[in-house]
Amino acid sequence: MLENVDLISAIITPFDDQLKINFTALERLTNHLIETGNTGFIIGGTTGETPTLTHAEKLGLYTRFAEIVAGRVPIIAGTGSNNTQATIDFTKEVRQIDGIIAALVVTPYYNKPNQRGMVAHFKTVARQADFPIMMYNIPGRTGVQMENATIVELSQEPNIIGIKQCTNLNDIGFLVENTPNDFAVYTGNDPETLGAVALGANGVASVASHIYGYQIRALLDAVKHGDLLKAGKLQRELTPKMEALFLYPSPAPVKAVLNAQNWSVGSPRLPILPLNQKEKLNLAHQLGVNHLADVQLHY
């Protein structure tokens, strides 16, 4: 299902001046990301500000996004929550949208189940929603971490097709080694891109691809062609820039860069604040330029 899908953009949700979804900006950005070499998308993830979207907004966003992509690359849509039944119900709605091939389901946050509870949650969602599921393990945001043994157990479930893993390279390597060959493992940490694919992961679910898509595409292609010197050089150049995009609560930094480049993606919704002028200048410095408008989006 995710063969040859190595660069997935966890795409932002553009807003207009009234903080309504800006579908014109979304279409323009989507086409650009495909042009830069993206081979898949996550819509409605963390970077997409899902917690600030209403149910109706999510359905409208996913439907329109699938129309924009028009089958060019696979789409995975966020449906997860800390309510198992609500996750099932929403996944059933989303599976009706043509072009969406799987649901991204995050570990249950706030109520913090134990490992047995997480197994029960994901198995119940996968079976009752009857739709391919990509698990999303991001303990830095959820307050709960799914252990490797739990993930390995869940990887045997037919409808659970993979994981977006936001922990460390040791975990990535363990999961690649101990899950079925058709279970897709993606790092959700941009600076781990080269390390993850070197360990056998499918690729990266990226935020930095909004800005450095050409470079990440070149890095992944260099690995495929066995040019590790080139891949290593690109990763070394990209890592501090990738880290800089998380200096402030995401997706505020990436939106600031895109707005400076006239992509008109708007501000984040509260509780995330847009960057102030001092923060923009600091971000530009960390990205190696004087102003965010100077960031080069082409490679």
Curated annotation (Swiss-Prot):
E.C. number: 4.3.3.7
Enzyme class: lyase
Pfam families recorded: DHDPS
Alphabetized InterPro entries for the sequence: Aldolase_TIM, DapA, DapA-like, Schiff_base-form_aldolases_AS
SMART domains: DHDPS
Catalyzed reactions per annotation: L-aspartate 4-semialdehyde + pyruvate = (2S,4S)-4-hydroxy-2,3,4,5-tetrahydrodipicolinate + H2O + H(+)
Keyword check for Cytoplasm: yes
Active site per database record: Y136, K164
GO MF annotation: an example: 4-hydroxy-tetrahydrodipicolinate synthase activity
A cellular-component GO term for this protein: cytosol
GO process annotations (BP): diaminopimelate biosynthetic process; lysine biosynthetic process via diaminopimelate
Main location per the UniProt record: cytoplasm
Pathway annotation: Amino-acid biosynthesis; L-lysine biosynthesis via DAP pathway; (S)-tetrahydrodipicolinate from L-aspartate: step 3/4
Residues annotated to bind pyruvate: T47, A205
Annotated compartments: Cytoplasm
Source species, domain of life: Bacteria
Transmembrane segments: none
Gene3D superfamilies: Aldolase class I
UniProt keyword Cell division, yes or no: no
Function according to Swiss-Prot or TrEMBL: Catalyzes the condensation of (S)-aspartate-beta-semialdehyde [(S)-ASA] and pyruvate to 4-hydroxy-tetrahydrodipicolinate (HTPA).
Subunit annotation: Homotetramer; dimer of dimers.
Cited NCBIfam families: dapA
Family statement: Belongs to the DapA family.
Protein name per the record: 4-hydroxy-tetrahydrodipicolinate synthase
Name of the coding gene: dapA
